């Protein structure tokens, strides 16, 4: 039986030095000493693969140039496989691991659309398999504090939720170490669901579902191309209807100059409203219908974000993206320990196939709405 003092062993598939997300997963998984990355097939490029292993202290005998060989050789020696390849390559790896009954931690988006979800469902058994998808923004302490406030009814009956994630990367690629970080080739092609929805939209869907604990019932959407990359959706606007007459909107963009990552949540009830901005993650803006305005941070009267696990350093020292990701990895660790011990205990912050499916169905409906120029219903 696993206890919460034991490190679990991970093998990475993808996520090398030349990956967009690999180093973040490596750092976040180990920040709280819950996991150790002990094996990997980090890159198809042998030099990058070897360099990544050396950088991360992975022994050459646990380094593989082929992910299938990694699975075969390490399946009895690691506790989970982490899938960090580009999204279009997820499906083959996921189905292979499920058929072998091996635990999976998968970078979002899970796959490229509902058709590939159906392939997963054909070999997935929720009572037998472990599949966690990493949506890290709900790992921020003040987002979790907001969820706590909503459950307490602090904002009253929710009426509106607006989520946005504007970025400028297609118009102004970030300069990293003197080199422009150009979009990866796979991001310049759309699939069953447009790639911008796989990249940014699934985060917005996750946050809305996490906070409201419900799915939208219908959407109307407008897709646009504003970049130099032809026939590629790079800007999406969506209106949403939810149960209980809740209205919502989502905006995601890769061509919004001035926004490195402008992720923002605004939520309105009949007693108050809240705003959280990812570039100022330790503050939650609250407004009440008696005129009070409040900025709540970890040093304030928090009832959830004041936990020790969210305060690796005392308030006044801002937390960041990797720490939020590490919060999620700790949640995954706890649920994975229960799974490996044969106990059925679900963590409230770990999400898998069902939410991934709902998100991809939403954006498939948005694509259809853009084509029909009309509202599209979402069916469970």
Task: Please place each PLM-identified region on the residue numbering.
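Hydrophobic residues in well-ordered beta-strands that form the structural core
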Residues: 106, 112, 131-133, 276
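Glycine-rich, aromatic-lined ligand/substrate-binding cores of catalytic
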Residues: 200-282
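Rossmann-fold dehydrogenase core element
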Residues: 119-137, 157-159
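N-terminal Rossmann-like dinucleotide-binding module
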Residues: 1-58
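Predominantly a Rossmann-like dinucleotide-binding segment in NAD(P)-dependent oxidoreductases
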Residues: 6, 17, 138-230, 284, ...
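C-terminal helix-rich "cap/oligomerization" subdomain common to oxidoreductases
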Residues: 1-7, 80-82, 327-380
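Beta-loop-alpha module in the N-terminal Rossmann-like domain of NAD(P)-dependent dehydrogenases
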Residues: 61-123
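C-terminal glycine/acidic-rich active-site capping loop/insertion
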Residues: 1, 136, 237-242, 271-350
